[in-house]
Amino acid sequence: MADLAKIVEDLSNLTVLEAAELSKLLEEKWGVSAAAPVAVAAVAGAAAPVAEEKTEFDVILVEGGAQKINVIKEVRALTGLGLKEAKDLVEGAPKPIKEGASKDEAEKIKSQLEAAGAKVELK
């Protein structure tokens, strides 16, 4: 065991350049590559379980923007609200416009509202 402790001590005292040279010498002597364990680690990391993709989104009106009239019109068209309700919703932002929407529907609503001048986010 004393020999192993001496080897560990000697290795600990190596400079980075000396350690790199030792690595190359050992690769040649044993016919292995130091890069192989890195590749295995990367593959193992990629095999980690993937988080489920979110399927339902809430479309949140963050801000009505400078063109509130256009945003109010778009909110009315998307939600079926009356003029006063749509105006109150836009002026009371941040407020949800649609909850539990599919990804495609949420993206469509977001793009329509942004085209009208609103700031929108999906949650």
Swiss-Prot record:
Q: Which SUPFAM superfamilies match?
A: ClpS-like, Ribosomal protein L7/12, oligomerisation (N-terminal) domain
Family annotation (InterPro entries): Ribosomal_bL12 (IPR000206), Ribosomal_bL12_C (IPR013823), Ribosomal_bL12_C/ClpS-like (IPR014719), Ribosomal_bL12_oligo (IPR008932), Ribosomal_bL12_oligo_N_sf (IPR036235)
For this protein, the record's CDD domains field holds: Ribosomal_L7_L12
Keyword annotations for this protein, in alphabetical order, are: Ribonucleoprotein, Ribosomal protein
Domain of life of the native organism: Bacteria
Query: GO annotations under biological process?
Result: translation
Q: Which family does it belong to?
A: Belongs to the bacterial ribosomal protein bL12 family.
The molecule here is called Large ribosomal subunit protein bL12
Gene name of this polypeptide? rplL
